[in-house]
Amino acid sequence: MTHELFDSKGLLGSAPAAFVAGEYELDSSHGTLPVINPANGQLVAEVPSSSSSTVDRAVTAAVAAQREWGRRSHVARAAVLEAVRDAIAVHADELARIVSVEQGKPLSDARGETEGACAFFDFAISQKYRAVGSMMASEPGRSLGVREEPIGVVAAILPWNFPVAIFARKVAPALMAGNAVVLKPSELTPLSALALARLCRLAGVPDGLLSVVCGEGKDTGRALVTHPGVGMVTMTGSTRGGREILAQVADQIIPVSLELGGKAPFIVFEDADLDAAVEAAADARLWNTGQVCTCNEVTYVHADLHDEFVRRVVDRFASVTPLDPFAAGSRLGPLVAERERTRVQGMVDAAVAAGARVRTGGGRPDGEQYQSGAWFAPTVLTNVRPEMDIARREVFGPVLPIIPFDAEAEVVSAANSTAYGLTAYVYTRDLSRAMRMIDALEFGEVYVNQAGPEQVQGFHTGWKSSGLGGDDGPHGYEKYLRRKTVYVRHAV
């Protein structure tokens, strides 16, 4: 039976299909990808997996389309992106339904994600009057200039946690900079990208300039990032996946931008606003069911506040009821897939075996409605030690380990001991201490007395094993450009 998401008049059409060089690819001879609703475990669709020959057609078409697109003025490119942004706003409800079905987040959060996608397009559009470059006299009768140019074809690899927002985060600046994009969404959430590709075409994005190929990373992804026509790879995903991409493209020597995993410490000092810290710690852990690279992954609380903080956070977590993404008042959905639920359960079980104490949650919620689907109850763990696996590896689920500390130097050392370096949080009323922590923490983003999300004009970048390059703002936009130095002798 065809899922209700598929309609000849809708963004997905009557059947799921890759979007390649302006055409819809229905060929399933290379296999299919099952799309499962994580709330109930039911099959939503089977999406054709793209072969290496399909990837080749997409990149070849992108090379041709980029030549014309790159010659357009910034203002002309921005006009197309404005049409895409407006189309996303018009179709926000349909896009949100697709996200909720395939990814599992509450419908209200999915609607917020579409708003975030529009914001990414807004920032890219703002670059239409960008005036960056230089021309200067170098010697009498000679000048020297440095200017920006598009890279060419960008291969974009997307994760499953924000399939609409991160599509926009990659596509908008890449196109605005004059590039073409061939994009591979996660095999768990391909429908959002396919819907957006159709929407982009309707909004006037030229055929071939944007293609979406579907498949697993080891097949379709590898064929894409190693294609000789690709000039840059941008990827958001796991650290393991980032390492694989770096190895795959090493022979090509092309720019790579990676936004990878994180193990964000959330540090609460004795002088913190306790109400604000508790609320932010919970929100930063439970947003998107904990499936955010910037989520609060381990909370360090000063010993003077520890017991009261734990009591309040446990009450807060226990009050959150996981609900079907389409249910009224839903604020916490399932994990994205059963494999993720199993992985998170294994980490919690290992922590308990090592001495951690479950204060609330700990596994699948009670109730018949939770027996199908990838459900996991909001979980708080205490008696956690910094050397435990759950305090060092990314959980990516609604699990909050809490660790007490006594001294500033102690917590800095513990926070920095992870291999990751994406996001950190600090709660204190002491400005001098806050500035010391900003200096000491080895993370690309530091939030002081607030939680996320990040803003489009900032720079979302990780240190250490959390990535290379980054997204957003002028620094992220520049990743999609290369520079050419021009020497001119004009005196004869």
UniProtKB/Swiss-Prot annotation:
Its EC number is 1.2.1.92. It comes from the Bacteria. Disulfide bonds: none annotated. NADP(+) binds at residues 160-161, 184-187, 237-238, 260, 394. Significantly inhibited by EDTA. Activity is enhanced by Fe(2+), but is strongly inhibited by Mn(2+), Cu(2+), Zn(2+), Ni(2+) and Co(2+). GO terms for molecular function: succinate-semialdehyde dehydrogenase (NAD+) activity. It comes from Streptomyces coelicolor (strain ATCC BAA-471 / A3(2) / M145). The AHG metabolic pathway may provide a useful platform for the efficient production of industrial chemicals and biofuels from red macroalgal biomass. Gene3D superfamilies: Aldehyde Dehydrogenase, Chain A, domain 1 (3.40.605.10), Aldehyde Dehydrogenase, Chain A, domain 2 (3.40.309.10). The active site is at residues 259, 293. Optimum temperature is 50 degrees Celsius. Maintains above 50% of the maximum activity between 40 degrees Celsius and 70 degrees Celsius. Involved in the degradation of 3,6-anhydro-L-galactose, which is the major monomeric sugar of red macroalgae. Catalyzes the oxidation of 3,6-anhydro-L-galactose (AHG) to form 3,6-anhydrogalactonate (AHGA). Shows broad substrate specificity, with maximum activity toward AHG. The enzyme activities toward D-fructose, D-galactose and D-ribose are between 40% and 50% of the maximum, but those toward L-rhamnose, L-glyceraldehyde, D-glyceraldehyde, L-fucose and D-glucose are much lower. This is 3,6-anhydro-alpha-L-galactose dehydrogenase. Pfam families: Aldedh. One of its GO terms (biological process) is gamma-aminobutyric acid catabolic process. It catalyses: 3,6-anhydro-alpha-L-galactopyranose + NADP(+) + H2O = 3,6-anhydro-L-galactonate + NADPH + 2 H(+). Belongs to the aldehyde dehydrogenase family. Keywords: Carbohydrate metabolism, NADP, Oxidoreductase.
